[in-house]
Amino acid sequence: MTVTPALLVILDGFGYREDSHDNAIALANTPNIDRFWTQYPHTLINASETFVGLPRGQMGNSEVGHLNIGAGRVVFQDFERINQAIASREFFSNPVLIEAVNKAKAGHKAVHILGLLSDGGVHSHQDHIHATIEMAVNAGVEKVYVHAFLDGRDTPPISAKPYLEKLEQACASIGGGKIASICGRFYAMDRDKRWPRVEAAYNLITDGQGEFASASALQGLEAAYARDEKDEFVKATAIAAAGEQPVTMEDGDVVIFVNFRSDRARQLTHALLDPDFEGFNRRRQPKLAGFYTLTLYDKAETRAKPIFAPVEIRNTFGEYVAQHGLKQLRIAETEKYPHVTFFFNGGEEQVFAGEDRILVPSPKVATYDLQPEMSAYEVTDRLEAAILSRKYDAIICNYANCDMVGHSGDLSASIKAVETIDTCIARIVKAMESIGGQMIITADHGNVEQMRDYENNQPHTQHTTNQVPLFFIGKPATLAAPGTGSLCDLAPSLLAMMGLKQPPEMTGKSLVAFQAA
């Protein structure tokens, strides 16, 4: 079967905002992207809120974005499913959750609740932590401990205080539960196998051993701020009142990990469960009575039981292309590799027939403002070679820079990230045009176009709800009007570019209307 080669380039975190103030895209020198606005058909599409299966007002994120893109339909997210379950009180009759708390109660053991404490809604939500505490306490569990990972990435960099205050108020209102430890997500939620970071969180959670100790979570936070540590980077701090010993994780205890997004929860889960773990030397591995996760983190990790089972997504773009016997490529650097593979394939680890993957290692730096080009040039080299090989019918590529550097809150570095992308993307457009291929350049959500939080007068490090631009390079065509399309329309658009009919499971619509020859 012969098709026109199609390429989707996802500029992660590249949103659209007309105001140029604190807008890294507007402030960057981007001769190529500037040219795209005048030379190629373009539009704006939606990448947040209900358009991607999230609640109103909720910013999009990379996991949600790639899931919707690959599915070709709006995928209602775990975040919203869990919110609805709590609102309807079905959460408190969930049989897996009942099993978890009953195991702890039967053995007079503790429930340890692990999770990112914020209202960011990207990896977790504080309401889910509060509901889990309520469930455990009302079931009669006497020892309910919260190990709170502080955000500052999907929320303002210095914003943890009200979340800790609200958690303490919730515990008081419920009549049980206490904060056992705090640390920044930089340590507890690493996803790049930087094991010394995870080790710090592991030792804190299992042995109550941190770099610091404090009589209360709020005092521990203030001490971290005095050390010039923003929320994301708060060092491991054990919380124990005067005369008390820090909380430790004992044999027979139960763990409930309440992050609903899997990618940054897997490594810590692996460290706590895997008897053959080799990331670092564990002082000990508690023999837990049960380990429960709010959603499925890893099908291969059968020792962890999901509270909310995954919803199967059939006939994703990758699966459908494979059914037609076509060749496809997924390429990204480490930070976004799971997104163009696992999430793009509907949350499936399976590699489809004819699907190749290229992983380019991300640079080993503490934060990406230190190296804003990341591995974009290496990704471009590999992508350009793949295009010119004429081997692939469909290619999905992600450039991580605008999102990962944008999360640092450093405007100067973010401008450099945008300029790097501008240089790289020009090479890719040239390569695709040279083989007669067609391509879409767009984003999965916004970030780098808003680098200042004016309300809190501090750097803006989280995603935005802004629309994202879309450029089409190919045969003469017109695009859907700005604001009428969304991420779920990208897979149908790619199939139309390839000359394939979309499957009935895809309810999105092609954004590209080709002009008659």
From Swiss-Prot:
Function: Catalyzes the interconversion of 2-phosphoglycerate and 3-phosphoglycerate.
Catalytic activity reported: (2R)-2-phosphoglycerate = (2R)-3-phosphoglycerate
EC number: 5.4.2.12
Residues annotated as binding Mn(2+) 1: 403, 407, 463
Keywords annotated in UniProt: Glycolysis, Isomerase, Manganese, Metal-binding
Lineage: Bacteria, Pseudomonadati, Pseudomonadota, Betaproteobacteria, Nitrosomonadales
Binding site for Mn(2+) 2: 12, 62, 444-445
Protein's recorded name: 2,3-bisphosphoglycerate-independent phosphoglycerate mutase
Record pathway: Carbohydrate degradation; glycolysis; pyruvate from D-glyceraldehyde 3-phosphate: step 3/5
CC terms in the record's Gene Ontology section: cytosol
Annotated substrate binding sites: 123, 153-154, 185, 191, 261-264, 336
Cofactor(s) the record lists: Mn(2+)
Quaternary assembly: Monomer.
